Amino acid sequence: MGACVVMTDINISSGLDSNATGITAFSMPGWQLALWTAAYLALVLVAVMGNATVIWIILAHQRMRTVTNYFIVNLALADLCMAAFNAAFNFVYASHNIWYFGRAFCYFQNLFPITAMFVSIYSMTAIAADRYMAIVHPFQPRLSAPGTRAVIAGIWLVALALAFPQCFYSTITTDEGATKCVVAWPEDSGGKMLLLYHLIVIALIYFLPLVVMFVAYSVIGLTLWRRSVPGHQAHGANLRHLQAKKKFVKTMVLVVVTFAICWLPYHLYFILGTFQEDIYCHKFIQQVYLALFWLAMSSTMYNPIIYCCLNHRFRSGFRLAFRCCPWVTPTEEDKMELTYTPSLSTRVNRCHTKEIFFMSGDVAPSEAVNGQAESPQAGVSTEP
């Protein structure tokens, strides 16, 4: 790293150590700092409120407690924590170049961002895998409730293990009287160990899961399209069921694409800096970093907006959650969307209809757990 750089050493989920963030010692005008503060404050508020509402909608309503939705809760929790504990604190550090938050929080900030990003993207991957099994291999056993909890716990444990090396080498230093939170990696020949760690982390928290999801959703899309061609037409409730599956897949594809777009420039920034360190000596680099960091962190606030726009149950949930606002008026239909449970006879008839249409090759009974047709409470809601 060039001598002109004041290193801010919080890794923001990029897999590259934070002492490569490249924030220069140049201070910004007060008006500029005020604009950036407003932008980051808006991001944090929208992300925290939106993801907290998503978690409430799912956990507070039995009809919404499904396998897929539990992964959405995991995703929302990671995004909420990322916005609350990483975006705000790292913005303060990046804009002031002084670490105000103590040694313990320095360790936490070099552990949690990679952990949260890993949890976010692998929760999306788990959703893609669940949809793949439900739609492409409907006769295969589905995740049970204990299995879902085990997958979520496994995601968090692997994420913590992946982030641990950076946390382990974190330390507090003083540079010209200013406290810094740095990652003091051990010296080796040419920094090969550090570069290898960077590449492994970027591959695991970005490129690999995106490739897996691209393949999964491509196969899902082809499968659903094949069921829509002439000769394989579904009708009535089964047509609506098929359309609901398509809409859910489109929603999750949009979530994944948004995540990929938001994080790609940030990863490229660090990759470029690894091979061309003098870019951090330019005066404009602080503004570039703050813009790329804001774009990456903004990925935490888009998912609730996407759910609200594309899923009518989440839309009803948001109306109920914000009913205290004068411009929001929830209806009885909104309450029914989240609380209504079909009668036993309705569920039996629905399962019977799915079985008939599946045997004819039209609609797969995707709401199956361990090979059995499930009730709305136990299954995966694919309705829009």
Curated annotation (Swiss-Prot):
A lipid is attached at residue 324 (S-palmitoyl cysteine). It comes from Bos taurus. Residues 57-69, 130-149, 219-251, 311-384 are cytoplasmic. Belongs to the G-protein coupled receptor 1 family. Pfam families: 7tm_1. This is a receptor for the tachykinin neuropeptide substance K (neurokinin A). It is associated with G proteins that activate a phosphatidylinositol-calcium second messenger system. The rank order of affinity of this receptor to tachykinins is: substance K > neuromedin-K > substance P. GO terms for biological process: positive regulation of flagellated sperm motility; regulation of uterine smooth muscle contraction. One of its GO terms (molecular function) is substance K receptor activity. Glycans are attached at residues 11, 19. It is a multi-pass membrane protein. CDD domains: 7tmA_SKR_NK2R. SMART domains: 7TM_GPCR_Srsx. The chain crosses the membrane at residues 33-56, 70-90, 108-129, 150-170, 197-218, 252-272, 291-310. PROSITE patterns: G_PROTEIN_RECEP_F1_1, G_PROTEIN_RECEP_F1_2. This is Substance-K receptor.
